[in-house]
Amino acid sequence: MSGETTPTPTPTKNDPTTRAVGSPRAERVAHALARDVRLPDGAGTLALVTIDNGLDHTKPTTFGPTGIAELTATLTSVRDRVRAGEVQAVAVTGKPYYLAAGADLTQVAGVTSREEALALGRGGHAAYGLLHDMGVPTFAFVNGVALGGGFELALNCDYRTAAADVRALALPETGLGLVPGWGGAYLVPRLVGVQDALDVILTRPAANKPFTAQQAERIGLVDVVLDTADFLEESVRWAARVLRGEVVVPRRELDDEATWRAVTDAARARLDATIHGSRPAPYRALDLVAHARDRSREEAFAAEDEALADLILSDEMRASVYAFGLVSGGKRPVGAPDAALARPVTRVGIVGAGLMAAQIALLLAQRLGVPVVMRDLDDERVAKGLEAVRSGVERLTSTGRLSPAAASRLLGSVRGTTDLADLADCDLVIEAVTEVLSLKKRVFAEVEQVVSPDAVLATNTSALSVTQMAADLQHPERVVGLHFFNPVAAMPLVEVVQAERTSPEALATGFAVASRLRKTAVLVADRPGFVVNRLLVLLLGVIVDAVEKGTPVEVADRALRPLGLPMPPFELFDLVGPAVGLHVLTSLREDLGERFPRSPGLARLVEDGTTVVLPAAGKGLPKPVDPAIQATFDAAREAEPLGEPLDEAGVLDSVLTALTREIGHMLDEGVVATPQQIDLCMILGAGWGFHLGGITPYLDRTGCSERVLGRRLLPDGVANVPTA
């Protein structure tokens, strides 16, 4: 297998991953246009300022230096009219679908000096401060998406209305290596209380969960939710009622000092337990919130300016903006063939009815809106698969994401069978059986006998050769890999695998299906483990190898804390299952050589039937290691010594060295066209944080890439503060 020649994905001219993702582009200026609106019932004149970049809804309104300067000029002019007695209220709103999406990140990433960074924060504070100092009531009519500095624009107003269909209100800065820098870290805890503020500023950004208008109203971020159809008119009427005293919006008292301290101390402990100091932004944001109770507005905003300037000039922020650019550009997949070549998919077959098969079947039925048939060997397996689909539909219904009528239609579109002939009229058949090459080959051979010559065959294999799987078929060109990740509905990545003889039509169909499923598709060559599993399994292999050499399990498990990964290695092992982990590690060792360590201790655990390495801990307690697990590794080492134990730093260095070397091999083999695609896969398929930029920016900034490969993986300044 290691000697096979596979097609190498080729970057295209417009490939977003081959340019400096965080490099500045020309500012899309957010214009601030003021007009007068006559308030009803003689309440006076409202100056309505609309933020609009003059582009369609696919180009969100963001603020760069010119936009902030224009907003400052417009609000200054409005304030002059207020002082002249011409205006009794001021409101801000946005173009259709957007209030504003915050600061222009490409402009932020272009900042190279502390003076520029400080000016960015101070400029926003000065502009928004005009709303606070206007001298008449100010309103934000939140008609659409309001993120970061866009939402802070609203927070600096006295009152906020929101349209009922608004689904994205957030301060996502800490997820991008920044802090809310235009008032949010001070205003939110004083508006909604310190506990809810930390949800807004820390918890939801980490989970990428913005607020809907209704959720924001419940905690007091907005004051009223109004019907979308006539939102602007209703907002104006509501503002008039506020001015006449008919509507009084209550504001909560500040939390007492003891509560404030207890909540922020608990939040700091949670950060220590989860990200272990790996990311500065959440800690800086927490510091700002912790002092928001007792600082004056001026002191708090000056502290925001300092924190923002520090973070803008950090590698973590540059990596985060780079990662954001990768994910944003991921919907335009690199190397995908002409979409017009894709075959129509009106009916899908799934071979297998296990957990992954059922998840794939449900998602296909839901997103493609086509009939799906699951086939397995006996009625019992088919029944289990259908029950898994039913449970998934019930979860969607119970959370309000499906109406009862839609749920009934969805259930009716998925059926099970033991008869292979029921797949005959499927345009696409996906196999999702056990990871055994001979079994998958047999499945494809059987399916090919009943489907049409134009039907596309796809495999959900996570590591096996798609080329070998298709080798004995009459039409191997119809086979493509579609590697979904578990849980299928939640994980946004699909690795689309181009085998040696995959046709452009089959490949285009794979990309089209991934797009209709709202997944980000990355083209990968048919090499063992593809991208995500090749790197994750190597990481786990190196960790286990350290334990084989005498490193205690707890030490090895803690070693990767500086990376701030979504879960420690042995927790990931427990999620995958020791047996599956051993199987894939052994398979990759056979295909790729001794870079993938063997593990006698892990083999013994599997022989003993062990399914969990770290038993579940009590709430708030660290997960303990079962002494029997450590004893098994110790016994295996006594029988066959493999080396010397390592400390945490040694384990981390071993992991980073191995990952760097493997990425070098992957690029040489053409598994993907660019390092950026590896980063995109690790972000979306392994949940690695934006602060890492995936993986290659971290390897560059720690010097691993130059030490191991003799070169950087990315150009200097693409995902880091330029060193020159």
Task: Specify the residue positions occupied by each region the protein language model found.
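N-terminal glycine-rich phosphate-binding loop for ADP-containing cofactors
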Residues: G3, P9-T12, R19-G44, D52-G54, ...
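STAS-typified acidic loop motif
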Residues: G42-A69, P96
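A short, well-ordered alpha-helical element
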Residues: T61-V87
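Amphipathic alpha-helical interaction surfaces in cytosolic regulatory modules
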Residues: L71, R83, P96-G110, Y128-L131
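Short, active-site-adjacent cap segments at secondary-structure transitions
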Residues: Y97-A101, L147-G148, L464-S465
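Conserved catalytic cysteine-centered active-site region
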Residues: Y128-A140
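Long, basic N-terminal domains or extensions that often function
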Residues: F151
